[in-house]
Amino acid sequence: MSNTEELIQNSIGFLQKTFKALPVSFDSIRHEPLPSSMLHASVLNFEWEPLEKNISAIHDRDSLIDIILKRFIIDSMTNAIEDEEENNLEKGLLNSCIGLDFVYNSRFNRSNPASWGNTFFELFSTIIDLLNSPSTFLKFWPYAESRIEWFKMNTSVEPVSLGESNLISYKQPLYEKLRHWNDILAKLENNDILNTVKHYNMKYKLENFLSELLPINEESNFNRSASISALQESDNEWNRSARERESNRSSDVIFAADYNFVFYHLIICPIEFAFSDLEYKNDVDRSLSPLLDAILEIEENFYSKIKMNNRTRYSLEEALNTEYYANYDVMTPKLPVYMKHSNAMKMDRNEFWANLQNIKESDDYTLRPTIMDISLSNTTCLYKQLTQEDDDYYRKQFILQLCFTTNLIRNLISSDETRNFYKSCYLRENPLSDIDFENLDEVNKKRGLNLCSYICDNRVLKFYKIKDPDFYRVIRKLMSSDEKFTTAKIDGFKEFQNFRISKEKIPPPAFDETFKKFTFIKMGNKLINNVWKIPTGLDKIEQEVKKPEGVYEAAQAKWESKISSETSGGEAKDEIIRQWQTLRFLRSRYLFDFDKVNEKTGVDGLFEEPRKVEALDDSFKEKLLYKINQEHRKKLQDAREYKIGKERKKRALEEEASFPEREQKIKSQRINSASQTEGDELKSEQTQPKGEISEENTKIKSSEVSSQDPDSGVAGEFAPQNTTAQLENPKTEDNNAATSNISNGSSTQDMK
């Protein structure tokens, strides 16, 4: 072993012994930096015992320190990973974190302080390469998130201002590391068949970390090449199915064919569509129109179902809560008391959550399909994803992509700056392209603009403005943000280059924390009561207390001066407030005189003579009483009319029901009267002489004959008339007969 190798090994042992004595844990150091005060000054100054003994053999101390720290981290991580134990892994990560913090805290003591940035990036990249699984990567990653400002310092020894970064993508130390980390991301992207949830979590955190390292105006931090993403199709084999010969033209096959045609000819190639001929645009329109009709029809059913469910829920809530609206969405369910105190329930609950946690932890390592990806190659799955009414995620995703694409096409056709920018970027990436950017006539431009406006404005935005205003506002804001981002991209993000955050410290606001005693509520503790007994000096302030009598005299003097001057000046701005203050002062002494005060007189009403109120005469009282009781009388009249009408209807119904009885009664009366008449005649014949009876009969017959009209002819001419009248009105006939019988009876009685 050479002297240098022995020096390195001894230095590593020295660091292990020194770092092991620090009172710090892995959970604390990965979230909070290690303060420099915890490390001895000799350690930070590189006054290590092995180095002091061989100081003559050291030519480049900074390079030697870098080698020692790298070997220290590699040894710590290798031993921890080989043991495959949780405690050893945390010990290795703890040593690595302490080593990185040591580089930062000792940056001023280097021969070349600017070299600390390269060392920090190199050691950090070494640790990332040694983490052999996503779980260990995620365990260590809070350290990188908590030290993001250290990375932005680059080679500077002073911290950068908030929002700024000294890193440049094409310069060290980030240049090589950025390429290496992009290769890691590419491997994760290409190896998605075997990726688990933690792989995707690791990929997201690394991408987010790289985007935060560089400023926003850095070319590597945005899509400077203006390339269009075509990554909608899932690369995961779990979302694919074996292709079969599609002989039938079912609805799912037609739907999938139209969707794929629109996706490959419009969404992922807006530049080709914008500068294509009319036939190409018409072909896309023929596939897009029925596809959009079908999707919007399903969306309409989706919102109708939501509206119906809400109406049902609201009706139930209204029926249950007639006076109060119950918002059950904000109510937190409470656990019943018997479940809280039941040991059996507690054991079952703990077992359930333990099993659920185990399932979740084991599920992180399980291969699974990416369910949020659209399966373009699976016809049945694609049809179900976009036509399922209960799930609108995939439809909303397609609608957003369609709006962004049509909006970009409109900008390409109408804006010369946008067209020139995308043209230069496209030709730089595809120099052999056959797109003719200059051969776009007015008819073709008009057709493209009309098609994009019809799809985006007339179909999509108008539909969601009525059905879903919230999503409509989301689309509008995203489109506006996309236009602003495109404008900034064309300008090279120059507006962010001059963006500087002020380095002046904002002084904290001064608070008066002195206590002023205004009131006091007695507490049960005497010590607390004594705290309130603080001499504030408020009791020593001399303040003249106003008495009600003095205020009354001042108000009266003011009123008298107003009367004597006979001037009605304009009311002061705060006159109402002053009068209220005066009344508050007078309340304790002159409360029973306040009946003289009203809105018109104000305080002056206390001193004015009370006006005599004219007594109301009897006629006025009667009119007033009549007006008050008018509505009551109207209700009484309506009630009487209702009662009379009800009685009339009842009487009419009774008469209709009693008509047959009346008719029977009349007939019986007629028979009785006839029989009585015959009996009287027989009796009279027996009592009177025969001569008198004959004379009477003669008189009656002569009178009957004389009563007939001599011009009427034979009496038989009148028989049909009487018969017809009798047929037309049989009741009249019966009445006449009864009348005649009664008259005959009476005449018979007279004769008798």
UniProtKB/Swiss-Prot annotation:
Q: Which domain of life is it from?
A: Eukaryota
**GO terms, biological process:** DNA recombination; mRNA 3'-end processing; mRNA export from nucleus; positive regulation of transcription by RNA polymerase I; positive regulation of transcription elongation by RNA polymerase I; transcription elongation by RNA polymerase II; transcription-coupled nucleotide-excision repair
> Quick one: a GO cellular component term?
THO complex
Residue segments, region Disordered: 648-752
* Modification Phosphoserine occurs at: S234
Keywords assigned: Nucleus, Phosphoprotein, Transcription, Transcription regulation
Q: What is its main location?
A: nucleus
Extent of Polar residues compositional bias: 720-752
Q: State one molecular function term (GO).
A: molecular adaptor activity
Q: Does the keyword Secreted apply?
A: no
Q: Which residues form the signal peptide?
A: none
Q: Where is the protein found, in the record's own terms?
A: Nucleus
Q: Does the keyword Phosphoprotein apply?
A: yes
Q: Where is the composition biased (Basic and acidic residues)?
A: 692-702
Q: What else is known?
A: HPR1 is not required for sporulation, and is not essential for DNA repair. It is probably not a DNA topoisomerase.
Q: What is this protein's function?
A: Component the THO subcomplex of the TREX complex, which operates in coupling transcription elongation to mRNA export. The THO complex is recruited to transcribed genes and moves along the gene with the elongating polymerase during transcription. THO is important for stabilizing nascent RNA in the RNA polymerase II elongation complex by preventing formation of DNA:RNA hybrids behind the elongating polymerase.
State how it assembles.
Answer: Component of the THO complex, which is composed of HPR1, MFT1, THO2 and THP2. Together with SUB2, TEX1 and YRA1, THO forms the transcription/export (TREX) complex. THO associates with DNA and RNA in vitro.
Protein's UniProt name: THO complex subunit HPR1
